[in-house]
């Protein structure tokens, strides 16, 4: 790819991507456009702009994508109740397609012929980014420095930075933090370092977002979440934008010690990896959404969704957000959400999210039918006999054959 003229780099301003920026200029002799995404990671992003300016970069993009992230990526995923391997709420996985999408858009806007990312050759993110690139712009050139260069240790990166006068001050990870961290509006992840020993408990100081459950308030807090079309639209009667609503749930969940997990997951590239995650708002939202569905979804539609959910979650985890099979599943899921409307009441207490009430104008729950009291003929219990005998037929035939 020696003919690369201009490349759009996903740029954080940290050590890795700053070295990549200089390396791209040196190796390819190309112009670099930097792109820094605000996905709600809580960092001041202007330092990334200033650092890019110090490199002499002429085209610098620092984009606030929080609303698009929540509205067009997080919320559609939560309509599916997507959970990977029973625990992971896909906070990193769902962010990569949006970054890839915006990189491709910037490449088109600036006339760039290539994109670049800072994901390593061992992880899932390289796959997620590049499947996104190719799914949106099949002819794009992709540069993945970690698969090309020999700067395969932090010491070599630091030496390269020193030789080229790259400022590496002020970043926590550059000071030798014991974890690799990634944050956005949905979660914070922690990997590597001491966590590579699967028997070692993560230190309390690692968790940057949530209170420990035992340190959470001793009094529970009740909240109401309103839904329309399968998406949350209000908390305690206050309508909020998608990003603001998720941010509010994060604050509530963090205060009450909600959303910590410590898991070993199966990466798409084949290895197992330990990760610790904080997903306070997402944990609340998942519980609330399932409660809302419990009274508004038809039984078999709900069961079909649950059967398909692991496949949907796997597609998101592996990076197939823009693939036709994910889009087909999304269309089916979205059709089921038309009547997912109403309010769920939750009790938040020391790491727990407890559903205590749900109501909907589209509810399929009919107390006059479900009651244990006199139902005034709404349900004839004698009808159950024929239903049971028909469903028992194959079991009776099997028992007869066995003698």
Swiss-Prot record:
Homotetramer. NCBIfam families: argG, PRK00509.1. This is Argininosuccinate synthase. It comes from the Bacteria. One of its GO terms (molecular function) is ATP binding. Keywords: Amino-acid biosynthesis, Arginine biosynthesis, ATP-binding, Cytoplasm, Ligase, Nucleotide-binding. Pathway: Amino-acid biosynthesis; L-arginine biosynthesis; L-arginine from L-ornithine and carbamoyl phosphate: step 2/3. Its EC number is 6.3.4.5. SUPFAM superfamilies: Adenine nucleotide alpha hydrolases-like, Argininosuccinate synthetase, C-terminal domain. One of its GO terms (cellular component) is cytoplasm. It catalyses: L-citrulline + L-aspartate + ATP = 2-(N(omega)-L-arginino)succinate + AMP + diphosphate + H(+). GO terms for biological process: argininosuccinate metabolic process; L-arginine biosynthetic process; urea cycle. It comes from Halorhodospira halophila (strain DSM 244 / SL1) (Ectothiorhodospira halophila (strain DSM 244 / SL1)). It is found in: Cytoplasm. ATP binds at residues 10-18, 37, 118. L-aspartate binds at residues 120, 124-125. L-citrulline binds at residues 88, 93, 124, 128, 180, 189, 265, 277. Its main location: cytoplasm. The gene is argG. InterPro entries: Arginosuc_syn_C, Arginosuc_syn_N, Arginosuc_synth, Arginosuc_synth_CS, Arginosuc_synth_type_1_subfam, AS_cat/multimer_dom_body, Rossmann-like_a/b/a_fold. Belongs to the argininosuccinate synthase family. Type 1 subfamily.
């Amino acid at each position: 790819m020696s003919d690369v003229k201009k490349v759009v780099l996903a740029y954080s301003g940290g050590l890795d991507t700053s070295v990549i920026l200089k390396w791209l200029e040196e190796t390819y002799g190309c112009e670099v456009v930097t792109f820094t995404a605000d996905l709600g990671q809580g960092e001041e992003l202007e330092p990334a702009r200033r650092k890019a300016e110090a490199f002499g970069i002429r085209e610098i993009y620092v984009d606030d994508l929080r609303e698009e992230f929540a509205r067009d990526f997080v919320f559609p995923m939560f309509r599916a109740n997507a959970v990977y391997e029973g625990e992971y709420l896909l906070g990193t996985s769902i962010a990569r397609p949006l970054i890839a999408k915006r990189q491709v858009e910037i490449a088109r806007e600036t006339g760039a012929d290539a994109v670049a990312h800072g994901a390593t050759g061992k992880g899932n993110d390289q796959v997620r980014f590049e499947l996104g690139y190719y799914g949106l712009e099949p002819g794009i050139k992709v540069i993945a420095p970690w698969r090309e260069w020999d700067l395969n240790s932090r010491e070599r990166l630091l030496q390269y930075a020193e030789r080229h006068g790259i400022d590496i001050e002020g970043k926590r990870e550059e000071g030798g933090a014991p974890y690799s961290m990634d944050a956005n509006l949905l979660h914070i992840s922690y990997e590597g370092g001491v966590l590579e020993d699967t028997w070692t408990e993560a230190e309390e100081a690692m968790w940057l977002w949530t209170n420990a459950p035992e340190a959470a308030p001793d009094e529970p807090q009740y909240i109401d979440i309103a839904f329309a079309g399968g998406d949350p639209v209000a908390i305690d009667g206050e309508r909020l934008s998608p990003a603001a609503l998720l941010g509010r749930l994060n604050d509530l969940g963090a205060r009450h010690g909600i959303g910590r997990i410590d898991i070993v997951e199966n990466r798409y590239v084949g290895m197992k990896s330990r990760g610790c995650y904080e997903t306070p708002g997402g944990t609340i939202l998942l519980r609330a959404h399932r409660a809302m569905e419990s009274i508004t979804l038809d039984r078999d539609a709900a069961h079909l969704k649950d059967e398909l959910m692991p496949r949907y979650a796997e597609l998101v985890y592996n990076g197939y957000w823009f693939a036709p099979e994910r889009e087909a599943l999304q269309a089916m899921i979205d059709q089921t959400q038309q009547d997912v409307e109403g309010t769920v009441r939750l009790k938040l207490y020391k790491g727990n999210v407890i559903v205590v009430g749900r109501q909907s104008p589209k509810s399929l729950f009919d107390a006059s039918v479900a009651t244990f009291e006199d139902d005034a003929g709404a349900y004839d219990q004698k009808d159950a006999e024929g239903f049971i005998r028909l469903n028992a037929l194959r079991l009776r035939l099997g028992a007869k054959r066995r003698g």
